[in-house]
Amino acid sequence: GPEAACMLVDYLLNTPEGTELLKKVSLALVPVANTDGYAMQIRKSGSGYDLNRDQSKLTDPVTLLLKKAYKEWNPEIALDIHEFNPFRKEFELLRGTKTATAADVLFLPSGHLNIPAGIRTLSNGLFREEAEKTLEANGYHSGFYFTPSVRNDSLYAMKDAKSPQSSSTFQGLTNAVSLFIEIRGIGLGRACFARRAECGF
């Protein structure tokens, strides 16, 4: 996430294409929302909260600051980039061996029905589909982000965020075209680091 954001900043400020783009759009970037957790390489913030589950409760001071900035900016498009663990315990439970998700990037659009249908269509259709085409053209693999579970020796995959605790749902409920983007990375250390940063960019 943060590396891809830095690559985007470099592109916008130091290339002719980026300079032209900045004449047409206004951007606000938050390279790292949970700076304490990022520094300690843990999910929770320095206050002990999971910022990914604090979109409605607004318990953490960082969440309040981010919410305030988001409200003031009032974006038309909102992206939230995270990392996912390609080795899912559910795969290992079924197969008895570690199995990795093949995708470089996974997309989680919101399926919350209080988000206008047109915005959901734009998020899940045009924006996601164009991103997937660009990724494929550059040699990367993508798919839908899903939450796996094992029941009766079968794997179930739930996709589309519906909880307002999810950033893609919260952002969609503000009438922004919203996508939650997951890049493979958790547990990989520096392995394939350049590929992971570049596919996010």
PLM segments and residue spans:
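Structured catalytic-domain cores with a bias toward divalent-metal coordination
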Residues: 1-201
